[in-house]
Regions:
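Metallocarboxypeptidase
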Residues: 280, 294-297, 304-308, 320-331, ...
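Conserved Rossmann-like nucleotide-binding pocket used by diverse enzymes
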Residues: 9, 107, 373
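Ser/Thr-rich, Pro/Gly/Ala-heavy low-complexity intrinsically disordered linkers and tails
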Residues: 1-2, 6-38
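Active-site-proximal loop/helix segments of hydrolase catalytic cores
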Residues: 53-99, 107-130, 195-304
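Conserved ATP-driven motor cores of ASCE-family P-loop NTPases powering translocation/secretion/packaging/pilus
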Residues: 308-309, 315
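Flexible, acidic/histidine-containing loops and adjacent segments that form or flank the divalent-metal
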Residues: 35-50, 56, 93, 116-252, ...
Length: 400
């Protein structure tokens, strides 16, 4: 049984750096490159939580800036292994918001090219070693303990993270719960899924005929400020599917995670709106008021899927960075490029100027045991029974 522990985030305390981040958080020294710029001179204003879903085409990247200026970049991907286009787009955008090239945290949701890029060429590597970004802490999943159909990108990142070159990023394995990310300004941040929360067997299964897809190991996280709840989960899978011909298998981790997340206001849609994610159980538990899809025009995967769009617009306002699959009817969805959430009080918030009000109740730890009531072992079971969506893959998965 797994429970979420959420505590108020406090001011960042990270290694010393060439210059302070906008809110006083510190990023690491020893990063290649100069000219980091003056933090706080960008578009972000003190007192505001901003979450920027950057339109970088096929590459996914999200920038979080807390009311006190601590920053976190979630992913920075590329469309191809030999590309640095995504990194250049992300780097310029981040500088425009922060006014500098200092990041308190970088979070890698999982090791797919479109989320992290290829070391030595693009993505996060390019931001640090070519653009001179300084990073206080790099958080990632345990790719040495859990490995499936990750391919060359996973292998390259494993090698890179073991090199002296990666020390500049201060890498650290993410763990369930709160504490590793301290954004300050009344913002709480907790990991709700890391390496499938033990639902998948540990080991390196890369040589198997249909090992767990890298998406299955995606890191999921819940950010909270006041009444505003925001959920992001990389490309977390929402169905069980074994494809020997494709050389991978998906496992329904969304259903297992849903009970830990409960209601949210804003959902960064997993896997670009794929039909393999955002399942009925997850959406029924979360009931998002706003859903955001980061997707590229011209993608060859059919993202976003019509079925997923239909599920999302049934309960939420939908925003997309690009249209994606031209045959998908977006219904009431809006294509807006960069999708930006802003709030100063954790209640009233805007998405690209459209106004919303956070409707979740303020989460209260009524008995003082460190757990919010939604996942309090004294009051409510957080056990999630996986929906047998296509069955359970007993080869790798813990089945009921």
């Amino acid at each position: 049984m797994v429970f979420i522990v959420l505590v108020s985030a406090v001011a960042s305390c990270l290694p010393a750096l060439p210059a302070a981040s906008p809110g006083g958080g510190q990023a690491s020294s020893g990063v290649a490159g100069t000219g980091t710029g003056e933090c706080g001179s960008g578009s972000w204003q003190p007192g505001w939580l901003e979450i920027h879903h950057i339109d970088a085409g096929e590459g996914v990247s999200t920038l979080v800036v807390s009311p006190t200026g601590q920053s976190m970049l979630i992913d920075a991907g590329e469309a191809a292994w030999d590309s640095d286009d995504g990194a250049k787009t992300v780097g310029a955008y981040v500088r425009s918001v922060l006014g500098c090239a200092l990041l308190d945290y970088v979070l890698l949701s999982h090791f797919h090219l479109d989320h992290v890029g290829f070391p030595g060429q693009g993505g996060v590597w390019h931001l640090v070693h070519e653009q001179g970004f300084a990073v206080g802490k790099l958080l990632h999943r345990d790719l040495n303990r859990y490995a499936g159909a990750g391919g060359e990108t996973l292998d390259a990142w494993r090698t890179y993270l073991q090199s002296d070159e990666a020390l500049a990023l201060h890498p650290e394995i993410a763990t369930l719960g709160a504490g590793q990310v301290q954004l300050g300004g009344g913002v709480a941040f907790a990991f709700t899924a890391v390496d499938a929360n033990g639902a998948l067997a540990a080991g390196n299964f890369a040589a198997d005929s249909a090992p767990p897809d890298e998406n299955d190991y995606s890191i999921a996280a819940l950010l909270r400020m006041g009444k505003l709840d925001y959920f992001t989960a990389g490309d977390l899978s929402g169905e069980t599917l074994v494809s020997v011909s494709g050389g991978y298998s998906y496992h329904d981790l969304e259903t297992r995670t849903a009970a830990l997340v409960k209601d949210v206001d804003v959902y960064r849609v997993s896997h670009h709106g794929s039909s393999h994610a955002s399942n009925v159980t997850l959406l029924a538990e979360m009931q998002p008021r706003v859903s955001i899809i980061q997707v590229a025009d011209g993608n060859t995967y059919g993202h976003p899927a019509q079925s997923t769009v239909d599920r999302l617009v049934a309960t939420s306002a939908l925003y997309l960075t690009e249209h994606g699959n031209p045959s998908t009817n977006l219904r009431t969805g809006k294509v807006v490029g960069h999708v930006v959430l802003r709030t100063s009080n954790g209640i009233d918030y805007t998405i690209n100027g459209d106004r919303f009000v956070a409707s979740d109740p303020v989460r209260i730890d009524s008995d003082g045991d460190g757990y919010f009531v939604e996942a309090d072992p004294d009051d409510h079971s957080a056990t999630a029974v996986p929906a047998l969506n296509g069955g359970c893959d007993a080869t790798y998965e813990t089945c009921p």
